Amino acid sequence: MTDLRNAEELIAEAAAAPIDGWGFDWLSGRATEERPQWAYARLVADRMARAAAALDVDTGGGEVLAEVPHPPKLLTATEGWPPNVEVARRTLRRVGATVVAVDPDGPLPFRDASFDLVVSRHPVRTDWAQTARVLRPGGTFLSQQIGAGTMRELSEAILGPLPPPAHRHPEHAAAAAEDAGLRVVDLRRATLRATFSDIGAVVWFLRKVIWTVPGFTVDRYREQLLALHDRITTEGPFTAHAQRFLIEATRP
C-alpha cells in the first residue's frame, strides 16, 4: 500500500527544485550513476591545453569548460536553452569564454574554419556538416553522447513497453561524421549502472533529462510515479542503465 503522504512530499519537493544548468548535485545521496572509463573531462582538458581556438557546443551551464585548467586564448561556447545561457555566462566568466545563445535547429553562427577544436558533451543533436565547416583543416571534434536506449528501464517504468530504439547508435554517428568529410579516429561505448533511492530523485531526473520521458509532468504520470514509489519502498533502489559513447573525429 502506498505511503501517500511520504510519496507526495517527495514528489512535491522534486517538482519545486530548480533544474537550471547541467549539474546533478541535487541528486547527491539520492541517486548514483557510473562514469565512463574514458574520463571525458580529462580528455577535453588535454585537448584544450593544445588548442588555439576551441568551441563547446551545447555547453549546458558550462560545467565541463569551467574545470579546464588551461583554456585556449579563444574559447567559445554555444547554448540553445535560454535558462542555461545566463548560467553558463556566469560560470564561464572566470575562464574567459564567450557564450553565444543559438537556435538549436539553426547553423553554427561562426565563419568557416574558425576552430581547431570542437567539443560537445551530451548534445541534443550533432549537425555534422556544420561541425566540419567550422573546424580548421587538421582540427578535432570530441564528443561524449547519449547512446540508444539510455535509461530504458526508467522510461518503460513510466511509459510501458517501448519499441527498440532507432536513434543515437554510435555506428550511425560515425557514418554521419564520415559523410560530412570527417575522419573518425576513436569510437567507444559504455553501459553505466544508475540507481534511484526515492521517487523524488526520479521526478527531478525526469524533469531535468527531458528525453527520458518526453512531455513529462507530475500530474500526467502521477499514477505511474506512485507505483514506482511502492516498488522502491518494497524492493530498494530502482536500477536503470545509461548508454554513452565517445566519438573523436578529425578534419583532413
For each feature predicted by the language model, list its residue ranges.
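N-terminal, positively charged/glycine-rich alpha-helical extensions of SAM-dependent methyltransferases
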Residues: 1-25, 34-35
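Conserved alpha-helix/loop element of class I SAM-dependent methyltransferases that forms part
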Residues: 19-53, 61-67
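Class I SAM-dependent methyltransferase SAM/SAH-binding core
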Residues: 52-108
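A short acidic, Gly/Pro-enriched loop at the edge of an enzyme's catalytic core
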Residues: 105-117
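A short glycine-rich, Lys/Arg-flanked "PGG" loop and its adjoining helix->strand segment in the class I
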Residues: 126-142
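Short, glycine-/aromatic-enriched active-site segment of Class I SAM-dependent methyltransferases
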Residues: 146-164
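Short alpha-helix
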Residues: 165-181, 213, 220-223
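Conserved Class I S-adenosyl-L-methionine
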Residues: 183-252
